[in-house]
Design a protein with these regions (language model features):
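Conserved active-site motif detector
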Residues: 1-263
């Protein structure tokens, strides 16, 4: 069995190195008709024995199963949970989506296992779009307070409304990620946080092309006042792209193997 095509609904798995706090894309999970296919990406090469520790497998094989494994099921809170609807609302969901659709959204919430599950951006009719939580609000605020700079970022977060815009800044001298894209308030110089690392290369590529950058928008979808900071601001980035634009077209997202085995 061959791993799914690029048109198949897919999510990627990212693992956080607690020492460096960097996120590394390590696998892709796809829903293909009545089963699921899991394969490792070249990003997993950066993090040693992650395949064995998390999946009890090797990097050289792909796997399939007829249901979501426990690692992924546990990312989706039970619909019977008392705060399920509240959490779904944080993610701009109705709660009636399929389990795979819920995984692609609830997976954006960091867990104690150090994993995130995030969906592939949509590229349809010449338009690129992706939704994400702003990363690094806590880290940015902590640094700001320590240096007495932009200590009002949390005050700003309390006032932002859905429909408001954020402005991207290409952080070309970022030592952790040369593709880093910082986000600031539309008015003023308040640094809010960052685009998630796994979407940054795409967004940087788009913003680096003047004609495409003019069409780009970063819009606040949800300001979750009752959520932890890492789930505070849900945003959407959208822009016009050429018909041949390929989302997540970098080595970290490329698959290591072609054949699938039973998981």
């Amino acid at each position: 069995m061959h791993l799914s095509s690029s048109n198949t609904p897919s999510v990627f798995v990212a693992w956080q190195d607690l020492a460096s706090r960097e996120w590394h894309t390590v696998a892709r999970l796809s829903q293909v008709e009545d089963h699921f296919e899991l394969g490792f990406t070249h990003g997993a090469d950066r993090v040693g024995d992650i395949a064995r520790r998390l999946f009890n497998s090797t990097l050289e094989q792909n796997y399939y199963s007829d249901q979501l494994t426990a690692l992924f099921r546990n990312k989706i809170p039970p619909r019977s949970r008392s705060d399920f609807r509240k959490m779904a609302n944080w993610l701009n969901l109705t709660g009636d989506e399929s389990d795979f659709e819920l995984l692609g959204k609830f997976g954006l919430i960091p867990g104690t296992d150090g994993l995130l599950v995030y969906p592939s951006p949509k590229v349809e009719n010449g338009r690129y779009s992706v939704e994400f939580f702003v990363h690094g609000i806590r880290h940015t605020h902590g640094e700001a307070e320590a240096h007495h700079l932009h200590g009002d970022v949390l005050k700003w977060c309390s006032e932002i409304e859905p429909g408001d815009s954020l402005c991207p800044l290409l952080d070309v001298q970022n030592p952790a990620d040369p593709n880093a894209v910082a986000l600031r308030a539309e008015h003023g110089t308040i640094l809010i946080g960052y685009v998630p690392r796994f979407y940054a290369a795409d967004i940087r590529t788009i913003l680096s092309r003047t004609a495409l950058a003019r069409t780009a928008r970063i819009t606040v979808l949800k300001n979750n006042h009752d959520a932890p900071l890492q789930m505070r601001l849900l945003c959407r980035f959208s822009a016009s792209v050429p018909d041949d634009f390929r989302a997540l077209d970098d080595s970290d997202h490329k698959m290591k193997a072609e054949e699938a085995a039973f998981l």
